[in-house]
Amino acid sequence: RGCRLGISFPEIYEMQCRAIFEALAQLKKKKIKSAFVEIMIPLVSTEAEIKIMKDLVVNIANEVQKQHKLKIEYMVGTMIELPRAAIKAKEIAKHAEFFSFGTNDLTQTTFGISRDDSGKFLNDYLDNKIFSIDPFVSIDDGVADLVDIAVEKGKSQNKKLKLGICGEHGGDPKSIEFCSK
């Protein structure tokens, strides 16, 4: 799953990246100036993982650019969806132009619970005030702390680091309020 697949079977990611960059090259040849892509490396937990995967992406992009004799615009970033990635964000940001916070997985891995089986106990946790909110609906304060840590550490390494969020929290007003800070 995630970048592990690309490290264990790089030919899969090479094929996917080549297809993306070939499509981008075709758009550039058609003079579509807005043609741009962001490649997001998923489930990164170490600097080495993103470095290996970014090198793969850059190599394929260079091959396609050379083959088509044109420059293509792209960025490489990662999804921050593991607590370790948030804690090691400074090192990861050395090789990322953006972070997208995968708050669904970050919530699951922070609590050690699965959305698939949380329905069996979540109401009990809410009734007993173990959780004040459903952490899969609104960002929990512990998950928010991990996001804050990752933003601070990532931006300390790369001032231009672009930030985003993906997942269901992106549609929740309380979570949006947190992200706007």
Regions found by a protein language model. Give the residues of each.
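Conserved alpha/beta-domain cores
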Residues: 1-181
